[in-house]
């Protein structure tokens, strides 16, 4: 199936990493096991400070779903367990031990039953990689997915391409073979053919995948690479029983690597990008998942007037350089953006030839230039205002949902109306562009994230005793 997306926005941001044939490998001293993506669930810690652990050791367990573990990608010593508001778990920082000895396993995928495979996925931390729709929560073992979507079309700003992510392997062919094994494991686990969505620029070994998966191609501006877009156009979610699990390319590689090589894949390609970073520091590197920023960037040489972001500029997590920033669980980018401390004098009188605008507030909105690169900073350029009921948001929203009515419905917690408007299909990332172009400065990502969590709790799906209501 071929899908052409027309609504969205191609963001040409300054500060892209330099393309290079050789990617340097950096071995970080500290690694974080990020627990923030599991904030919707109750977790039980399996480690304490100063514990000695091995790669693959359980770090946390789903409290309401015993047996599902989040595991460590490395061997080392637990340096710190960090908590946030109301003692919520943020992450576990591990000090790597020299000369990593990765724990090896021996699993023959062809000889495993689905029940045995499920136990392996839960025990080895592979099940914790899945995300579940509706609600955009970690996948629950009590739910059986209608479909599984694998995303090979991610086009978030600065994010390493699928081809670039294969650099952790000795060859492209080896990487796709590992991917093939991962797809086979997922297909056998759930007894279905996963949907694999890629772009025309990616040459997939389709001959090997056609028998085990549905292959789709998608084109168009950001966010054509969002899982929500893929689900919306291929197999829409119409009610709460339409359970869909999603995986990224990197996560399928992790699954395939365990069954093929017998050990955890703990490396990934990371983009160091952003206009707040010197051009000599913008590059791609290979490092351990969850690596601390200081191992990858000389923070002492970077201006204090920048924002450090784990992830892309639109949906990433703002980090405090004084609090040992580390890569998030699903992040493959460190974005460094200027953070001006002073307001621009008479900025409302300036033409804004190079300022980003979608509503033609500045002159740049009337100039059709092919190679204009935006240099955004973290300034809001105005204060928070009432939501403007306009169609500008819908022009950058590829899903066929009305943005403003949906936002108003979830703010007032009218979830019945919200579901009628498409609430079950969305995730916070889908509102990155509406937030970016919003004249009202409304934090739509946060609103949707909190609303999804609240509604999931209201349905009771996060409890082991939950049963589908006929």
UniProtKB/Swiss-Prot annotation:
GO BP terms: namely: sodium ion transport
What GO molecular function annotations does the UniProt record carry, in alphabetical order?
Answer: oxidoreductase activity, acting on NAD(P)H, quinone or similar compound as acceptor
InterPro entries the record matches? NqrA, NQRA_2nd, NqrA_C_domain, NQRA_N
Q: Give the catalytic activity.
A: a ubiquinone + n Na(+)(in) + NADH + H(+) = a ubiquinol + n Na(+)(out) + NAD(+)
Alphabetical keyword list: Ion transport, NAD, Sodium, Sodium transport, Translocase, Transport, Ubiquinone
Q: What is any Pfam family matched here?
A: NQRA_N
Task: Supply the EC number(s).
Answer: 7.2.1.1
Family, similarity comment = Belongs to the NqrA family.
Annotated HAMAP family: NqrA
> What PANTHER family has UniProt attached to this entry?
NA(+)-TRANSLOCATING NADH-QUINONE REDUCTASE SUBUNIT A (PTHR37839:SF1)
NCBIfam families, A to Z: nqrA, PRK05352.1-1
Query: What job does the chain carry out?
Result: NQR complex catalyzes the reduction of ubiquinone-1 to ubiquinol by two successive reactions, coupled with the transport of Na(+) ions from the cytoplasm to the periplasm. NqrA to NqrE are probably involved in the second step, the conversion of ubisemiquinone to ubiquinol.
Instruction: Spell out the protein name for this chain.
Output: Na(+)-translocating NADH-quinone reductase subunit A
Provide the organism lineage as a comma list.
Answer: Bacteria, Pseudomonadati, Chlamydiota, Chlamydiia, Chlamydiales
């Amino acid at each position: 199936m071929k899908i052409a997306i027309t609504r969205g926005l191609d963001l040409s941001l300054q500060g892209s990493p330099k393309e290079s044939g050789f990617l340097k490998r950096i071995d970080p001293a500290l690694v974080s096991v990020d627990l923030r993506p599991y904030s919707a669930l109750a977790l039980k810690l399996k480690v304490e400070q100063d514990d000695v652990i091995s790669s693959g050791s359980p770090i946390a367990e789903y409290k309401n779903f015993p047996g599902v573990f989040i595991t460590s990608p490395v061997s080392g010593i637990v340096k710190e367990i960090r908590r946030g508001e109301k003692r919520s778990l943020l992450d576990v920082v591990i000090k790597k031990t020299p000369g990593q000895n990765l724990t090896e396993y021996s699993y023959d995928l062809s000889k495993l039953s689905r029940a045995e495979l499920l136990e392996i996925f839960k025990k080895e931390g592979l099940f914790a990689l899945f995300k579940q729709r509706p609600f955009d929560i970690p996948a629950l073992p009590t739910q059986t997915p209608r479909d599984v979507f694998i995303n090979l079309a991610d086009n978030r700003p600065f994010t390493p391409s699928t081809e670039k992510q294969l650099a952790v392997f000795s060859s492209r062919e080896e990487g796709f073979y590992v991917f093939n094994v991962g797809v086979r494991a997922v297909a056998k686990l759930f007894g279905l053919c996963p949907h694999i969505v890629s772009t025309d620029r990616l040459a997939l070994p389709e001959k090997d995948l056609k028998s085990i998966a549905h292959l789709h191609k998608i084109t168009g501006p950001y966010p054509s690479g969002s899982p929500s877009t893929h689900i919306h156009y291929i197999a829409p979610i119409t009610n709460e029983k339409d359970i869909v699990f999603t995986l990224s390319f990197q996560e399928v590689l992790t699954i395939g690597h365990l069954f093929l090589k017998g050990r955890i894949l703990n490396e990934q390609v990371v983009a160091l990008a952003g206009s707040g970073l010197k051009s000599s520091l913008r590059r791609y590197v290979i490092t351990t998942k969850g690596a601390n920023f200081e191992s990858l960037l000389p923070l002492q040489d970077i201006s204090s007037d920048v924002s450090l972001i784990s992830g892309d500029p639109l949906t990433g997590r703002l980090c405090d350089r004084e609090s040992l920033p580390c890569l998030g669980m699903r992040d493959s980018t460190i974005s460094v953006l200027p953070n001006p401390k002073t307001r621009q004098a008479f900025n409302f009188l300036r033409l804004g030839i190079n300022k980003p605008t979608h509503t033609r507030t500045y002159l740049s909105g009337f100039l059709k230039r092919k190679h204009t690169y935006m240099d955004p900073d973290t300034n809001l350029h105005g204060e928070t205002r009432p939501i403007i009921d306009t169609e500008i948001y819908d022009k950058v929203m590829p899903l066929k949902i009305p943005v403003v009515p949906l936002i108003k419905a979830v703010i007032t917690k009218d979830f019945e109306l919200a579901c009628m408007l498409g609430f079950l299909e969305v995730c916070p990332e889908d509102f990155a562009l509406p937030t970016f172009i919003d004249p009202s400065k409304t934090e739509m990502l946060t609103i949707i994230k909190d609303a999804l969590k609240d509604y999931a709790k209201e349905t009771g799906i996060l409890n082991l005793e939950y049963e589908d209501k006929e």
